[in-house]
Amino acid sequence: MQRSIAMTAKRFLHRNLLENGKPRTASSPSFSHCSSCRCWVRASSSVSGGDLRERLSKTRLRDIKLNDAIDLFSDMVKSRPFPSIVDFNRLLSAIVKLKKYDVVISLGKKMEVLGIRNDLYTFNIVINCFCCCFQVSLALSILGKMLKLGYEPDRVTIGSLVNGFCRRNRVSDAVSLVDKMVEIGYKPDIVAYNAIIDSLCKTKRVNDAFDFFKEIERKGIRPNVVTYTALVNGLCNSSRWSDAARLLSDMIKKKITPNVITYSALLDAFVKNGKVLEAKELFEEMVRMSIDPDIVTYSSLINGLCLHDRIDEANQMFDLMVSKGCLADVVSYNTLINGFCKAKRVEDGMKLFREMSQRGLVSNTVTYNTLIQGFFQAGDVDKAQEFFSQMDFFGISPDIWTYNILLGGLCDNGELEKALVIFEDMQKREMDLDIVTYTTVIRGMCKTGKVEEAWSLFCSLSLKGLKPDIVTYTTMMSGLCTKGLLHEVEALYTKMKQEGLMKNDCTLSDGDITLSAELIKKMLSCGYAPSLLKDIKSGVCKKALSLL
């Protein structure tokens, strides 16, 4: 059996190394090239065995810092005789938990140079570290060395390699490795299969994941909660809500209890698809099954309720979350603050803002952006500007969205001149302005009758390396209509079609539809009913006409 496994694994190893270019040795970075490692030379080399045993205890290793771990290794390799390989493995495992994979690889090489004989556990640690560093070829080299020494790979070995392949999106190689192991009578555990299914789902190959799922069931391998959760996530991300719900039911029928991750994934999917009622029912089902919702579950549901203007229910859910001992984080606060601001209840949003500070949570750029926009929407320009000024005082860096909100708010509230001062300052500071920034200013100019200035700015976009989107075009066309510049409107319309921006009803977003409706209204009010308007009505904006 061992010889059969070794021969098959060697063939697989040889094929994979050749496919990926020149075979590489398993040599790993020397200590001089490992930034995390320090000098090995110490003033004293006398180390007592009792001291080492105490430092290698589970209690000490549990919270060990990297520098202390390297010091301990240095003392271990100076000790005579060397500590057992079990002790070295325990230390290496502790460093793995720190995610310092390159350090583990270097220490493993040092052990080899010193003649400290590895066991299967050591090889598995090093293979896993190479895989975590996205160096699957080097992991395969270690596998080859391990086989030459007569060690038989176990489930951990195969699981690590499968994970390594999947991390590199080499799912077919992962499947091939598992198939080869099965051929020779080796039975990988569900962990290896789960890694493959999860990888297929994350690369949008959900149908392949389902086929693989059915195949392992036929082989008599029982899926677990991780298997189902990966599939539920994959289906949700592919907008296959019904299939995900059926899979959840199938899971329960097979007496595999879903966990909070499974439920949260499906609940979030329902929310994003506008199925808030189903999301609430799923939440209630979780509670009935004694599965405690976590911060992700609550935040998803709060977000869904806010998106559908059920702000009071969202607030109640927030209070329930806190009462259950689930501490609200900045994301959950931002979600509810945004809901209040959208509902024109910015003062309620401010209460939450102050509550965050009282609870020791630090507001971020998103928090400030949300409240600044909320004040502008409420018509409180002074408060919005004051809040913007506070950002610098509290060390919160504004991003491009902050400035876009500021420009839009000023323009919408009749403060174009102030907006232009800020816009000019942004240009002087060579900020990375996006199409939203320019569209906002163009809209503000058109709104105040400065169509020529808007047209000049629009025409300069290509020189700035920016491409107008449908919002930019529609905004500019609307402004031109007010000045009776039909020739320019028709030219822009033709350009939009050439750019492929004239979408059909199926692909228009809600914002695009609203803009199209506004444009049609503007053209009708200006007395235009040429073939252009007829074309727009019949082709692009059937949905928009319902808004007229």
Curated annotation (Swiss-Prot):
UniProt keywords, alphabetically: Mitochondrion, Repeat, Transit peptide
Sequence ranges of the PPR repeats: 84-118, 119-153, 154-188, 189-223, 224-258, 259-293, 294-328, 329-363, 364-398, 399-433, 434-468, 469-503
Keyword Repeat (UniProt): yes
InterPro entries with a match to the protein in the record: Pentatricopeptide_rpt, TPR-like_helical_dom_sf
Record localization: Mitochondrion
Annotated GO CC locations: mitochondrion
The keyword rRNA-binding is assigned to this record: no
Transit peptide: 1-43
Pfam family, one: PPR_2
Gene3D superfamilies listed in its UniProt record: Tetratricopeptide repeat domain (1.25.40.10)
PANTHER family the UniProt entry points to: PENTATRICOPEPTIDE REPEAT-CONTAINING PROTEIN 3, MITOCHONDRIAL
Similarity field: Belongs to the PPR family. P subfamily.
Name of this chain's protein: Pentatricopeptide repeat-containing protein At1g62680, mitochondrial
